[in-house]
């Protein structure tokens, strides 16, 4: 108790050395500080336990009883360990925290050893010989080392590891080669021959042996068949197999099933597994066979097509309007959206007898579609033929009127109050071979048979005429539509059946008859009254510009040398739609001349001045109908100070104002209508225009041989504001900017202008110079310096050969 620390340390070291010298356990003294007396006891207990274990090992090895030795060792080791651990724990002044892992390792190391493990194994062998159950050994893993006695790890040699791996690979390759040789050793090579092929005796022996084996096999088969027939086994087996064969699901049960794939997607010789398509539990319908891989492939192909598909606009695309049974199938308005709204229509076919499908029905349906399609299209066309100027007899049949319709028209004409019994015949213009012209308004036209018969009836049944009138304005009288309505009542069914052209023709014929009747009434006027009327017109013409608006002067024309000369100078022949219509007037003149000749030539000179006149006898076809305004070409100029109307009239006479001929509307008043001749011309042209528009779409029946070598070269060019021709890209950009209402930015515009300037410089440059004229500048510089070269860098003095610098 009263010893110093130095003395206490020497005592502990002596105790540790004594314990180690006695051959006791390798147990280290506790780390905590204990009393000197307890340490000696613990070391003494440890040494006594070691001696007991040594004696028990020797005793067990001598007697051969491992079990008793092991039990004694276990008891002695446990007893010594308890004593060694219990005694120091009773009296401890200061104790540190225990290390459980360290103590367990120390105890296991003390209790286990090579001799004990061998004795347990020998004990188990003896127990096995005696038929007893072997002892269970709880093997405790040895730790690699402790803190006081660490165990060094094995050194890893990479060269040894590599050699070991190479050796393993060589062994595996040798093993694989050996197995391959064993497998291929049974197969004969091409160079090896069977010994019995070359030796005749060996071949005969082998043949006899094979024959014997065949005979034995046949005998065994016959014997087995006889036994089966005797015991009835074969019949039972056949019945059993037949029943199983009938119960099995075979190809005959596949008849009528639908395969939801196109028949072209199955290739010949390829095996495809079809399964039933999934459907809802409550969904009714037949079973459908599908292949999962083909469904995925079709879906992938469709997705690829949808990705690269562009929106198409085909407003005139014609789909097949006939189904498989040659029936008209309904067409949807927007067929391209049917798949999105109603879903995709899958391709399918049905399996036939035996589960086979050859696509015969699909091919038959396709052949029917092809036949129907070919029937609708014919490649045979009518050969070219010469265009006839006149209608053929077959075409004239369509223009003939029935007798019933003719009688009705004649009856309506008889109901007219005023009839022309002195109507001039139009002449024998029709012949059997003349069937009318295709060019309406450009030649003679045939008078319909209805008109001829009506004219004959009117001549046979004359009516008293009203008293004649000497008013020249009757020529300008307009026949209203209400009077024409008397010929054909609007409510009659016959009028509804007639086409528009026939109704217009009948109206014009009726008006023509009445106008001719009024003109014939004018011929019966007294000549004195005509002279007075002419004198009145002359007096009114001399009064001045106020008499210009008199409608009575429209029917008179005055000819003199000056007016004829001015008329010839001012006439400009035009043949367009807005021209003079000289051809139409010539036709009307020709018809009027024939009417005069048929009437006996009783027309007077005064009648010629009413509406028709001949300027030159040599040119009978050049007639001009002048109004009253044409006679005042060289009259006295009106006084301008009378007002604005006088000034405008003066400007109009001098040609300073552009006058446009306006179409006069039809009114009820007789003094506001057009002349009869002009009125008839306009109506005839309206009818002709209607038929000509219809003939525009008939096309030509013969090619223009004069235009065989004509190959038009059409070039569409665009220019900018400066007159420069634009490229297709620039033209498109200009149209796009004009359409969208926005142009390029500032930078793009500047770059484009710079590029245009460079192109202009390239066009202006000389063939021996650059666009900027550098060659010309170089020559000018050389000429100024009088040197055959030019200095690009440095000063001229440094490059001078006469100057020497150091």
From Swiss-Prot:
Residues 157-231, 494-540 form a coiled coil. Ubiquitously expressed. Shows a high expression in fetal liver and a low expression in adult liver. Pfam families: HIND (PF19252), SART-1 (PF03343). There is a cross-link at residue 141 (Glycyl lysine isopeptide (Lys-Gly) (interchain with G-Cter in SUMO1)). Residues 32-42 have a biased composition (Basic residues). Residues 58-101 have a biased composition (Basic and acidic residues). Sumoylated with SUMO2. One of its GO terms (biological process) is mRNA splicing, via spliceosome. Keywords: Coiled coil, Isopeptide bond, mRNA processing, mRNA splicing, Nucleus, Phosphoprotein, Spliceosome, Ubl conjugation. There is a cross-link at residues 125, 133, 141, 147, 188, 277, 329, 336, 400, 414, 554, 654, 663, 690, 705, 715, 729, 755, 764, 781, 786, 797 (Glycyl lysine isopeptide (Lys-Gly) (interchain with G-Cter in SUMO2)). It comes from the Eukaryota. The modification Phosphoserine is found at residues 321, 348, 480, 492, 527, 597, 602, 604, 627, 767, 795. The modification Phosphothreonine is found at residues 189, 430, 701, 770. Residues 1-121, 418-504, 578-610 are annotated as: Disordered. GO terms for cellular component: Cajal body; catalytic step 2 spliceosome; Golgi apparatus; nuclear speck; U2-type precatalytic spliceosome; U4/U6 x U5 tri-snRNP complex. InterPro entries: HIND, SNU66/SART1. Residues 104-119 have a biased composition (Low complexity). Identified in the spliceosome C complex. Component of the U4/U6-U5 tri-snRNP complex composed of the U4, U6 and U5 snRNAs and at least PRPF3, PRPF4, PRPF6, PRPF8, PRPF31, SNRNP200, TXNL4A, SNRNP40, DDX23, CD2BP2, PPIH, SNU13, EFTUD2, SART1 and USP39. Interacts with UBL5. Interacts with IVNS1ABP (via Kelch repeats). Belongs to the SNU66/SART1 family. This is U4/U6.U5 tri-snRNP-associated protein 1. The gene is Sart1.
């Amino acid at each position: 108790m009263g010893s110093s620390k130095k003395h206490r340390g020497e005592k502990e070291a002596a105790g540790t050395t004594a314990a180690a010298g006695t051959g006791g356990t390798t147990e280290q003294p506790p780390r905590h500080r204990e009393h000197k007396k307890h340490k000696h006891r613990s070391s003494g207990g440890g040494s006594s336990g070691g001696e007991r274990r040594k004696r028990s090992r020797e005793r067990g090895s001598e007697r051969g009883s491992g079990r008793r030795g092991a039990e004694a060792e276990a008891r002695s080791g446990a007893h010594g360990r308890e004593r060694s651990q219990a005694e120091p724990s009773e009296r401890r002044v200061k104790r540190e925290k225990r290390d459980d892992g360290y103590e367990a390792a120390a105890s296991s190391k003390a209790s286990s050893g090579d001799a004990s493990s061998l004795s347990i194994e020998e004990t188990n062998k003896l127990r096995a010989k005696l038929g007893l159950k072997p002892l269970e050994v709880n093997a405790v893993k040895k730790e690699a080392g402790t803190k006081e006695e660490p165990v060094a790890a094995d050194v890893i040699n990479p060269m040894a590891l590599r050699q070991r791996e190479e050796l393993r690979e060589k062994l595996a390759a040798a093993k694989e080669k050996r197995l391959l040789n064993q497998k291929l050793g049974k197969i004969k090579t091409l160079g090896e021959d069977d010994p019995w092929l070359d030796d005749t005796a060996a071949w005969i022996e082998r043949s006899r042996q094979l024959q014997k084996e065949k005979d034995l096999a046949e005998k065994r088969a016959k014997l087995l068949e006889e036994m089966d027939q005797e015991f009835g086994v074969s019949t039972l087996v056949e019945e059993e197999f037949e029943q199983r064969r009938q119960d099995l699901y075979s190809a005959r049960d596949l008849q009528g099933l639908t395969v939801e794939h196109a028949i072209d997607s199955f290739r010949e010789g390829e095996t495809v597994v079809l399964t039933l398509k999934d459907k809802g539990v409550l969904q009714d319908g037949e079973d459908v066979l599908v292949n999962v891989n083909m469904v995925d492939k079709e879906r992938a192909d469709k997705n690829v097509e949808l990705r690269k598909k562009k929106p198409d606009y085909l407003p005139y695309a014609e789909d097949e309007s006939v189904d498989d049974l040659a029936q008209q199938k309904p067409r949807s308005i927007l067929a391209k959206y049917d798949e999105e709204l109603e879903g995709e229509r899958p391709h399918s076919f049905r399996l036939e007898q035996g589960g086979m499908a050859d696509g015969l029905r699909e091919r038959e349906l396709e052949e029917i579609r092809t036949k129907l399609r070919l029937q609708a299209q014919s490649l045979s066309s009518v050969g070219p033929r010469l265009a006839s100027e006149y209608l053929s007899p077959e075409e004239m049949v369509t223009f003939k009127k029935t007798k019933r319709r003719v009688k009705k028209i004649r009856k309506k004409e008889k109901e007219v109050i005023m009839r022309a019994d002195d109507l001039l015949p139009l002449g024998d213009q029709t012949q059997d071979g003349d069937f009318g012209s295709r060019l309406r308004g450009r030649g003679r036209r045939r008078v319909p048979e209805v008109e001829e018969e009506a004219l004959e009836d009117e001549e046979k049944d004359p009516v008293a005429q009203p008293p004649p009138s000497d008013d020249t304005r009757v020529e300008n009288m307009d026949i209203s539509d209400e009077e024409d309505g008397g010929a054909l009542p609007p409510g009659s069914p016959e009028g509804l059946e007639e086409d528009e052209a026939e109704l217009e023709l009948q109206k014009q014929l009726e008006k023509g008859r009445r106008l001719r009747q009024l003109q014939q009434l004018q011929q019966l006027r007294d000549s004195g009254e005509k002279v007075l009327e002419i004198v009145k017109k002359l007096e009114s013409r001399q009064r001045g510009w106020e008499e210009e608006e008199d409608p009575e002067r429209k029917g008179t024309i005055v000819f003199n040398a000056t007016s004829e000369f001015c008329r010839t100078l001012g006439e400009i022949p035009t043949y367009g739609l807005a021209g003079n219509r000289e051809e139409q007037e010539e036709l009307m003149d020709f018809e009027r001349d024939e009417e005069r000749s048929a009437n006996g030539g009783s027309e007077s000179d005064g009648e010629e001045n009413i509406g028709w006149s001949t300027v030159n006898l040599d040119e009978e076809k050049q007639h001009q109908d002048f109004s009253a305004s044409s006679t005042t070409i060289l009259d006295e100029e009106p006084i301008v100070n009378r007002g604005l109307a006088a000034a405008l009239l003066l400007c109009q006479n001098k040609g300073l104002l552009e006058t446009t001929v306006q179409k006069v509307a039809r009114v009820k008043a007789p003094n506001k209508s057009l002349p009869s001749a002009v009125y008839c011309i306009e109506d005839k042209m309206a009818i002709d225009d209607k038929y000509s528009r219809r003939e525009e779409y008939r096309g030509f029946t013969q090619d223009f041989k004069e235009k065989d070598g004509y190959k038009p070269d059409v070039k569409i060019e665009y220019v900018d504001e400066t007159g420069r021709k634009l490229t297709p890209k620039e033209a498109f950009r200009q149209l796009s900017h004009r359409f969208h209402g926005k142009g390029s930015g500032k930078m793009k515009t500047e770059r484009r202008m710079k590029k245009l300037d460079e192109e202009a410089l390239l066009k202006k440059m000389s063939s021996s110079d650059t666009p900027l004229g550098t060659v010309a500048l170089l020559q000018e510089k050389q000429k100024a310096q009088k040197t055959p070269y030019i200095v690009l860098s440095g000063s001229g003095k440094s490059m001078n050969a006469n100057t020497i610098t150091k």
